């Protein structure tokens, strides 16, 4: 019982399509090798899958370029002539653009002005003025941007300086005050005689005969 006839149409499932392509490609390559060996033919095959993967086969006695050259000789035409002519036209167009730009540059530098008419000179002057305004605008923009950047750096440096000053000020403040027997209260400073007064304790008189006496330096008990 023979196999049923397969309808030739595009396989919608991508996986099935790729599997079928791989199998058929292998079969075509096998037939091409058989033709090369059995019939001494020059065969070239170039294939691209739907995913863009490239495959080729060429008889060992030649190469792809040789096959294309023989093909062009056989049909009497060139495969590259149209592309070559397009490249020539593109090159000529680019040369014209380059020549015009060089002429414009020289004219803006004050050269090659002898052949220009009044209207052309006036148009050139307007173009130069417009370019000058654009350059000035760009210059001022750069200056403004740099100035703002420098201001931010200066502000940041000043804030860091103030923070450092505050930290240093806190570190230099003494941890204790000392008693000033002269009635001045607490003093955070440290003089030459402050060490003796740092830990001064005042003795409160408890004897009746001591009531009413001034608390002078003779009634102070000092440590060390």
UniProtKB/Swiss-Prot annotation:
Keyword rRNA processing attached: no
| A GO-annotated cellular component | nucleus
Database matches in SMART domains: MADS
Asked whether the keyword Nucleus is assigned, the reply is yes
**Domain K-box: residue ranges:** 84-174
- Regions crossing the membrane: none
Q: In which tissues is it expressed?
A: Expressed in lodicules, stamens and carpels.
* Protein role: Probable transcription factor involved in the development of floral organs. Required for normal development of lodicules and stamens (whorls 2 and 3). May function as a heterodimer with MADS4.
Q: What is annotated about its quaternary structure and interactions?
A: May interact with the K-box of MADS4, MADS6 and MADS8. May form a heterodimer with MADS4.
Additional remark text: Inhibition of MADS16 expression by RNAi reduces expression of MADS4, and transforms lodicules and stamens into palea/lemma-like and carpel-like organs, respectively.
The entry's protein name is MADS-box transcription factor 16
